Curated annotation (Swiss-Prot):
UniProt-annotated stretches for the region Disordered: 292-319
Main location: cytoplasm
Alphabetical keyword list: Cytoplasm, Methyltransferase, rRNA processing, S-adenosyl-L-methionine, Transferase
Catalytic reaction(s) noted: cytidine(1402) in 16S rRNA + S-adenosyl-L-methionine = N(4)-methylcytidine(1402) in 16S rRNA + S-adenosyl-L-homocysteine + H(+)
UniProt cross-references to InterPro entries, sorted A to Z: RsmH (IPR002903), SAM-dep_MeTrfase_MraW_recog (IPR023397), SAM-dependent_MTases_sf (IPR029063)
Record protein name field: Ribosomal RNA small subunit methyltransferase H
Amino acid sequence: MEPGPALEHIPVMLEQALELLACRRGGVYVDGTVGGGGYSEAILRASAPDGILLGVDWDAEAIGRAAGRLSAYGRRAILTKAGFAELPEVLPRHGFAQVDGIVLDLGVSAFQIDDAARGFSFTKDGPLDMRMDPGLPQTAADMVNTLPEKDLADLIFRLGEERWSRRIARAVVERRRERPFQRTLELADTVAATVPATRDSRRIHPATRTFLALRLAVNQELESLERFLSGALDLLKTGGRLCVVSFHSLEDRMVKGQFKEWAKSCRCPREAVLCRCEGRPLVRLLTRKAVRPDEREKERNPRSRSARLRAVEKQGVPA
């Protein structure tokens, strides 16, 4: 989501997501990652004149921005500060048992990246924070300054898929013995000085994967996604649709794996002699493989380059 000169928030693959979501008038839809409100506003337009949009985000600043953007839609737009993993509790509070569609645009927003004070950027100096919700107990600085070297290396390797994780962790521990990390550029410069120059490093910043790993850990993003997916179908009406835009392989593998499991024609245990589930899949795959942004969108919006969109439709399940 590449910002323009005034911190413009550009939703990734908006047209494709809307087509897959198939909004209709009078429907109830959830934007589980409100961000700048781009998906939310598009859904409200597509479900006019009486569709309802429930938007959640655990970043209070995002909710505030979206409230201003969506004010013209009045009661059709309902916004609340919460994470998408909390939707099973949030929906009943607003009088909804199930909804017609849910969209998630995972990861960090343009506003969060471009606000140096939030601590997500490895190119702008700011406090080493990375919390999407400032109420979370642990910052990236806390992790960098306290994790044992092996644990830090494992985290960077597992969540950032960084091949140089051990070398980076060793350099971080040596540097923090002199003084603790407090600023984003302190960490970014340490990583950049540690990672060998490769063809890949000319394309992406050397600290990209380390910052990704820390952000995922600080915000427990994969845990939130797993928790959401475990109960997502219960939130949808029959025929309801779930669209997920992910930005890195760990998220996409989780979404792809869960969608594939739901789409199985038989869900009985392997040891079962006879099929008792009647061979009916829980969902219909709307995307056989991930939808990717076209070259025009990637040029207009560089942050869309790694995006993958997957979608399913909930099927009727026999009693």
